[in-house]
Amino acid sequence: MAERRTRSGGAAQRSGPRTSLTKPSKSSKRKSGSDLPNSFSEIWPRTTPAVPVRKAIVLKKIVAHAVEVPDVHTVRRSPRISFILEKENNPPLKVPTKEDLFKTCSVPGTPSSTPVLYTQNVEPDSGEAELDSRDLEMSQKVRRSYSRLQSLGCASTSTPGRRSFFGFEGPDDLPGVSPVVCSKLIETPKVPAKDLVPARTKDLVPDSTKDLVPARTLPGISPPVVKEKRKKKVPEILKSELDKWAVAMNAEFEAAEQFELLIE
């Protein structure tokens, strides 16, 4: 027992220093703030900074074009007349200058010494004389058209209760023209009834209205005479013939029912 204990003690003594020699040290050195830049240089190697390149940028400012206005403002006769009196399909070869524009806009037929603005007042008396003669002529034409009304005193029809008889001397002439007036006032020449009324309707019209019936047989205007359609005569079938026909049909039906149809 003592030997075992000594052996175990010796083994323990021997194993003690062995464990202390083989045990690795887990402690690591912490890097301070002064050592950080050295560590970054180890990770990322230093590179020389590239030289900055300058690029030229062009900035353009949009400015409105200066409008060239001619020095002398000429009075244009009409806004439709253009400065360049040329056709669109035949453009001019040279660019027109201010002098060319001034020449084309000048009014033809007027001297260069006289101004353009005073051309409207040339010979005012002749224009007034023409207008007066034309007014006189037109007034005479108008008076002719209304002279008939003025003589009768019926030119004004603005009053609602006043009747106007345009083209007639008075109300006595109206019954002979107006169809609305009673038929007793109408004096028509008596025409024989044969000429006015057709042969078929002659007996139907009473004697009092025979004179008032207008002629309906006008060539090219009156409607065509409609003829009465005649009824077709249906042939009568005797009862004895119907009975014979029924007996024959019944016999045929009975023969068809008694027929024996054999199917193998």
Swiss-Prot record:
Localization (cell): Nucleus; Chromosome; Cytoplasm
Renumbered residue ranges of the record's region C-terminal Sororin domain: 242-264
Name used for this protein in its record: Sororin
Main subcellular localisation: nucleus
Motif (FGF motif): 166-168
Motif (KEN box): 87-89
Modification sites for Phosphothreonine: T97, T110, T114, T159
Region (Disordered): 1-45
PTM annotation (Phosphoserine): residues: S20, S32, S34, S78, S82, S106, S222
Post-translational modification: Phosphorylated. Phosphorylation, as cells enter mitosis, disrupts the interaction with PDS5A and relieves the inhibition of WAPL by CDCA5. Ubiquitinated by the APC/C complex in G1, leading to its degradation.
Highest taxon above the source species: Eukaryota
Keyword set, alphabetical order: Cell cycle, Cell division, Chromosome, Cytoplasm, Mitosis, Nucleus, Phosphoprotein, Ubl conjugation
Molecular function in Gene Ontology: protein-containing complex binding
GO annotation, biological process: cell division; double-strand break repair; mitotic sister chromatid cohesion
Assigned protein family: Belongs to the sororin family.
Gene encoding the protein: Cdca5
Description of how the protein assembles with itself and partners: Interacts with the APC/C complex. Interacts with the chromatin-bound cohesin complex; the interaction is indirect, occurs after DNA replication and requires acetylation of the cohesin component SMC3. Interacts (via the FGF motif) with PDS5A and PDS5B; the interaction is direct and prevents the interaction of PDS5A with WAPL.
Function as written in the Swiss-Prot or TrEMBL entry: Regulator of sister chromatid cohesion in mitosis stabilizing cohesin complex association with chromatin. May antagonize the action of WAPL which stimulates cohesin dissociation from chromatin. Cohesion ensures that chromosome partitioning is accurate in both meiotic and mitotic cells and plays an important role in DNA repair. Required for efficient DNA double-stranded break repair.
Organism: Mus musculus
Free-text domain note: The KEN box is required for the association with the APC/C complex.
GO cellular component annotations of the record: chromatin; cytoplasm; nucleoplasm; nucleus
